[in-house]
Amino acid sequence: MGVVSISSSAARSPLGLGNDLLTHRSSLKKPSIVAFKADDSSNSALIIPPREQVLIPAEKHNEKKREVTRRKPCKTPKKPLSLEHNSAPSCSLGVDYNEAAARLESIYKLSPATTTLVEDDVEDGGSKAKVSRRRKRKESGEEKKVVVRNNVKKEKRMSLDKRIALKRNVQEKPVVASVDKKVTKRQQEEEKIERLVRDYSASNDIVSLDWKKMKIPPVLSSTEHAWLFKLMQPMKALLEVKDVLQKSLGREPREAEIAGEINMTAGEVKKKIEIGRAARNKLIKHNLRLVLFVMNKYFHEFTNGPKFQDLCQAGMRGLITAIDRFEPKRKFRLSTYGLFWIRHAIIRSMTTSNFTRVPFGLESVRVEIYKAKTELWFEMGRPPTEDEVVERLKITPERYREVLRAAKPVLSLNSKHSVTQEEFINGITDVDGVGANNSRQPALLRLALDDVLDSLKPKESLVIRQRYGLDGKGDRTLGEIAGNLNISREMVRKHEVKALMKLKHQARVDYLRQYIV
């Protein structure tokens, strides 16, 4: 399709074409004729200006011009428009240029419509090309097979050399790991032994233990017991060798002599003995509960007495004997084996420490009598008689009385009462030394007694007067006194105990003694 236009200005070009496509520019200031021809094919044709003049209103021309400006710029055709001078009509000097210019101007004004057609054709061609491309893509996509791949990739098989090297490494690693484990176990055991020697190397101070207030360490596990007794075995062997050498030499052997006897160095002998003593001290310290258990079970009557500390010390000696003589190979428990030796040591201490020597057999029978009395009391709900105890133990009555007579506690006259804290010797009165001449009149004694009672608190004085009949109305029970004073019986008993303790004060006793002696 071709376009022909005539322009009177040099800068104006038809259809927005550049100056390089202008076919002819006249040097005169007259309109020039330019001819365009796109192609010689059948689809292209030369536009010939019509002979009739077409008038187009200015408004329509402006609207069409705006449409052209709003639309996208026209794409250039694939083949550039060629200019042919031969196809252009020849012009002569006899042509009316004004008329030709007017006609061409009217044709030019119609040119935007033609351009829009061209642009629409180009755009339609582009859209068709895009549609064809999409169809080709779809057809090509349909031909391809859809393959779903797994995200987990399979490992490739290694080469033969790599497999052989890997197998060698796997075989060598367990050997190295076992060696490392042995080294770490040895190091841990050595550190544990060093800690044991550092903490328990000092011997236990048996005498200074306070069995009522001290905190006993927790009981050890069976594995810990076995490990400690294992550490004690070399020390026991060395001590046996030491005893043999001491008997043969007649003196205490040195460490070098003991080491030469068993083919060891003096340092090794010293280290073995230190480790064994530390293990022994730890076993003693962590099994002190056995001593208290035996005291509470078999010697309950001595737990609150003055002999409690002494008996606990004796039980501790029995525990040490049990630890020294214990044999782990027999698979017995230390608690079962140690109970016998602890009880035996306590009973032996009780028989040897008494002021009057009591045979060991009598002391063991006394323990059995006490146990039988306790069992019968729980069974019958009352204190058992002598015949019932004898029948339970199957002993003669004479043996029973002999044991009780020998088991009576022997107290010193200078020992103090548990409640009043007064010596027993102060309660003994020399009746033979009191004569009639040294006696005082009852009135003076009564006044002195009133003075002493008045020095007490009012309630304490009333309780003593009513309790012992000093008010002239006879002795009264705790219930009667409680009713008179409007207090409980327990409070009456407390007032009585406090008053008696105050009356036994040395100053009050001396004041009353001068009226008695």
Curated annotation (Swiss-Prot):
Signal peptide: none annotated. GO terms for molecular function: DNA binding; sigma factor activity. The keyword Transcription regulation applies. Mostly expressed in siliques and flowers, to a lesser extent in leaves and stems, and barely expressed in roots (at protein level). Isoform 2 accumulates specifically in flowers, whereas isoform 1 is expressed in both leaves and flowers. Present in old seedlings (8 days). Residues 62-85, 119-144 are annotated as: Disordered. Belongs to the sigma-70 factor family. InterPro entries: RNA_pol_sigma-70_dom, RNA_pol_sigma70, RNA_pol_sigma70_r2, RNA_pol_sigma70_r3, RNA_pol_sigma70_r4, RNA_pol_sigma_r2, RNA_pol_sigma_r3/r4-like, Sigma-70_RNA_pol_init_factors. Pfam families: Sigma70_r2, Sigma70_r3, Sigma70_r4. A motif (Polymerase core binding) lies at residues 310-323. Essential protein. Sigma factors are initiation factors that promote the attachment of plastid-encoded RNA polymerase (PEP) to specific initiation sites (e.g. psbA and psbD) and are then released. Essential for blue light-mediated transcription of psbD, which encodes the photosystem II reaction center protein D2. Plays a role in reproduction. Required during female gametophyte development. This is RNA polymerase sigma factor sigE, chloroplastic/mitochondrial. Residues 1-34 form a transit peptide.
